[in-house]
Amino acid sequence: GLMSTLKGAATNVAVTLLNKLQCKLTGTC
């Protein structure tokens, strides 16, 4: 459903942002 799609998209965005943040903090990209 729509909520499932939105939840999946939000999760993808959150993971991407966390990866970028970790990349900047730890220098492991």
Curated annotation (Swiss-Prot):
At the top level of its lineage, which domain of life is listed? Eukaryota
Keyword Repeat on entry:
no
What's a Pfam family in this record?
A: Antimicrobial_2
User: Which tissues show it?
Assistant: Expressed by the skin glands.
Q: Which UniProt keywords apply?
A: Amphibian defense peptide, Antibiotic, Antimicrobial, Disulfide bond, Secreted
Question: Which biological process terms from the Gene Ontology are attached to this UniProt entry?
Answer: defense response to bacterium
Instruction: Write out the annotated subcellular location.
Output: Secreted
Q: Record's InterPro entries?
A: Antimicrobial_frog_2
Protein role: Antimicrobial peptide.
Similarity annotation: Belongs to the frog skin active peptide (FSAP) family. Brevinin subfamily.
What is the protein name stated in its UniProt record?
Answer: Brevinin-2Rc
Question: What is the protein's species of origin?
Answer: Pelophylax ridibundus (Marsh frog)
